[in-house]
Amino acid sequence: MSENTVIAIDLAKHSFHVCVLSTDNKVLTDKTFTRSSLKTWLLKQKPSLVAIEACGSAHYWAKLSEQYGHTTMLISPRFVKRFLSGHKTDKNDALAIAIASRQPDVKPIQVKTDEQLALQASERIREHYVDEQIATNNLLKSILYEFGITVAKGKRSLVKAIPDILEDAENGLPDVLRGEIHRLYQFWLELDELIQTSSKRQQQSINAHPKCSMLKALDGVGDVNALGLYLALGDTGASFKNGREAAACIGLTPKQHSTGGKTVMLGISKYIANKKLRSNL
């Protein structure tokens, strides 16, 4: 094998299908590996291009392949899907990945470092706490509303009102439900503490990070957006040819419809990119 040879890997938790494509697009290898056997096999191969669909654990396998001396390419699942023929099987998926890696218009996804993955995970954990708190807030309001108890808008208004609602014996709230509401109230308070702790740690990490601090100098970019831009653009966008490519990566360019030499620019496309980051920006 050589760097012109493509090793396409269809990832899963325990079973991995590999398709090796030669320079003249002939399938040299088409077999399934276990996790341990794939590592051993990759280590024995000569330096090649390892193409992987960007899914769960893709960054781990890309970095491992690079340690073994290979060149790696992470490809968007949407791009790979164009080249899938026949039924969706591990074999066909691996072949589609191999074919996609050979296309002239393929736009590889940058492999994230361990530091970037850790920052991304911490932000997802914080977002999970926030989502859980919103869900708990809405659940409490809907339960109380069924018994004719309304609370002013805002999450803080609800939390302040809960103790008084539980102590009011004349509001028609069944005794069997008061204990459940109290537990939900305590759960909300625990989530609020977790959010504050997580946000504080995240802010410290961002302030100590030189690239994030650089991004915060941009107008309208705070801690959360600086982290989002760093994770989306990598090394402050050094891998992009120009600012337009970077803007397209995060979904801030208008959708284009061209035909017959006429170009029509539409609204901001919502087809790609990080929806959370795009909405924040």
How would you name each of these model-derived features?
Residues D24-S48:
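Nucleic-acid-processing active sites and adjacent nucleic-acid-binding tracks
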Residues M73-Q110, D114-A121, I162, G260-I272:
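Short alpha-helix plus adjacent loop in nuclease-associated cores
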Residues M214-A217, D223, L227-L281:
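Phosphate-backbone recognition surface of nucleic-acid-processing proteins
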Residues S37, Y60-L64, L139:
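Phosphate- and divalent-cation-binding pockets in alpha/beta enzyme and binding domains
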Residues L43-K81:
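Conserved DEDDh/DEDDy metal-dependent 3′-5′ exonuclease domain
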Residues R124-M214:
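Glycine-rich, often acidic, oxyanion-interacting loops/wings at catalytic, nucleic-acid
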Residues E3-L21, I97:
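Gly/Thr-rich phosphate-binding beta-strand-loop-beta motif of the actin/hexokinase/Hsp70
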